[in-house]
Amino acid sequence: MLTFKEVKTRSIILTLKRPIKAKIAYIKEWPILLIDLYTNEGIVGRSYLQPYIGKSLKYISSIIDDFNEVLQNKKLAPYDNFELMRQSLHFIGYEGLSLTAVSGVDMAIWDAVSKAASQPLCCYLGGTVGPVKAYNSNGLWLEKGNVLSKEAKFLVEQGNFSAIKMRLGRENYNDDLKAIETVKKAIGTDVKLMVDFNQ
């Protein structure tokens, strides 16, 4: 059985090649928080968080650092550890950045216990390893038609994808319909198109 030793975080901010142009924000940089959870037995569980806003990194890191005291020398038991972390935040609240911090450490715990069992996490949880269909969603935000057409072709070619995803949510729904037509024309009938309308 693994026991908790320490959790550390490292913050990085990436400059996006294609900024995110959503209804609610224009994002040029992407924050990532790397999490390393060390056990007394030498196994390291890893995870990462992508909290959207760079300044949130310091708040989440601070919460995660507090979990060192909460979990010190505790056996790694994902469900029990999750509850301990969550309960330690009772007066702060169980949502937003606090639960994001809990989730990051929770993923690192699952990574550590599956490594200790010498299994991929999906197998440790009862699943199987196999091919997974993937699509490219690394673009196609709320851009104009000429940009969308060029980006759509690039996304398909980037990894020989058979499906891509675009975002909707323009002020006028007719502009969304035109954007869909533009992308469909650019990618042809052999590539599937998915959409997000979440802005």
Please report, for each region that a protein language model flagged, where it lies by residue.
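Metal-dependent enolase-superfamily TIM-barrel catalytic cores that perform enediolate-based chemistry
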Residues: 127-199
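Metal- or metallocofactor-binding catalytic centers and their adjacent structured scaffolds
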Residues: 6, 38-116
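Beta-strand segments within the central parallel beta-sheet cores of soluble alpha/beta enzyme folds
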Residues: 6, 83-84, 122-127, 136, ...
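Glycine-rich, aromatic-flanked loop segments that form ligand/cofactor-binding clefts
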Residues: 106-142
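Residues at beta-strand starts and edge strands
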Residues: 31-33, 65, 132
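Structured beta-strand/loop patches that form or line metal/cofactor-binding pockets in enzymes
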Residues: 1-46, 50-52
